[in-house]
Each structure stands twice: as structure tokens, then as C-alpha cells.
Amino acid sequence: MPEWALYALAAVAGYLSGSIPFGLVIVKAAGLGDIREIGSKSIGATNVLRTGRKDLALATFLLDSLKAGLVALAFTLLAGREVGFVAGFAAFIGHCYPVWLGFKGGKGIATYAGLLAFVSPLHGLVVAAPVWLGLFALTRISSLAALTAAVAVPPGAWLMGERNSLILAGLALLSVFVFWTHRENIGRLLKGTEPRFGAKKKDAPEA
């Protein structure tokens, strides 16, 4: 198969995998209604947590991670790390803009985590995870932790010796997308109104 065809196949497969709306399916299966009518209306794990079911939120996070990670791993084994990264990147896009839901999906953090875990695990473990966990522990603001981790990954990967231009460019572009999908959160962060985990509902706007 020509190289361009492998990249195209990876992109299509990744997008279709990423566009599976696990959050929507899980919440409906649990009899809790349409997640798109709850909280921020996002299909991601953070919004699923607003149903009060931590188990459903965890399941959503894991499945959203795997739908990017497994397709990325499959194409990495089939055609190399660059093609695998393209598949995972496309899964991120599919999650954020699923064709089945009118291109209105989640914010991409779980799929980003899945991509890192299966294609660049060292960058995820050494850079993304400690930054997210550390900042979340300090602030209890999930969006701030996610945005900071997204910013840290590209330079962190470079400092750790990553020199593949496609991977570095892709990581930088993913950071841009994360900021875009979190633009409403950024607005609230600037106003000081972004909710913290554990805050009383009456004091916490929708994230």
C-alpha cells in the first residue's frame, strides 16, 4: 500500500474510532437521559461526572482514552509511529467533532491522554501526568490542569529528546485544539468563575 494511503487510512479509521460517543451511550444506558442536556452539554467524562455517577465518568474516561490509544497502537504496529500518531490525532478530532452528533463532541482530554499513553508514553508519564496531577491537587480546577499540561507536553517532549518533526508539530497542534475546545473555560478562568471540584453547586458555574 502506498505511504499516502496508509496515512489516509489511519486518519479515517482514527476519526471514526474517535467519534464513538461513549459518554452519550453510557449515560443513556444507565437511564440518566441525554448527557448533551446536562451541565456543559459535553459528551466527555467531566460532564458525565455531573450525573453524580463517578463510575460512569471513569468508564467514559477510559473508553475515550482507549478509542484513541488502541487505533494509534494498531497503526503504529502496522506502519510505524508517525502513522500511528496520525490515527490518534484523528481520533482526537473525531471525539471533539463527531459527525454523528452534528460535530459537537467533547473537549478531547481523555483522547489526548490515550494518544500519549500508546504512542508517546514517556511524554505522558513524565510531563503530562505530573503537571495535570500537581496543578489539579493545588487548584482543584480540572480545566486549568488540562490546559497547563497541554502547553507543557510539546516543549517537554523536545527537552526529552523527541526530534520527529511530525510528532512535535502534532503535539503543538493538539495543544492549540485543547485551548480552542476549552475557550469557554478560559473565559471563566480569566473572570475567576471557573468551578473547582468540591465546590458547592450554587457557587459553581458549568464547566
From Swiss-Prot:
Belongs to the PlsY family. The keyword Ion transport does not apply. It comes from Hyphomonas neptunium (strain ATCC 15444). It is an enzyme of class 2 (transferase). Pathway: Lipid metabolism; phospholipid metabolism. The keyword Glycoprotein does not apply. This is Glycerol-3-phosphate acyltransferase. It is a multi-pass membrane protein. Keywords: Cell inner membrane, Cell membrane, Lipid biosynthesis, Lipid metabolism, Membrane, Phospholipid biosynthesis, Phospholipid metabolism, Transferase, Transmembrane, Transmembrane helix. The chain crosses the membrane at residues 7-27, 58-78, 83-103, 116-136, 141-161, 166-186. Its EC number is 2.3.1.275. One of its GO terms (molecular function) is acyl-phosphate glycerol-3-phosphate acyltransferase activity. It is found in: Cell inner membrane. The gene is plsY. GO terms for biological process: phospholipid biosynthetic process. It catalyses: an acyl phosphate + sn-glycerol 3-phosphate = a 1-acyl-sn-glycero-3-phosphate + phosphate. Catalyzes the transfer of an acyl group from acyl-phosphate (acyl-PO(4)) to glycerol-3-phosphate (G3P) to form lysophosphatidic acid (LPA). This enzyme utilizes acyl-phosphate as fatty acyl donor, but not acyl-CoA or acyl-ACP. It comes from the Bacteria. One of its GO terms (cellular component) is plasma membrane. Probably interacts with PlsX.
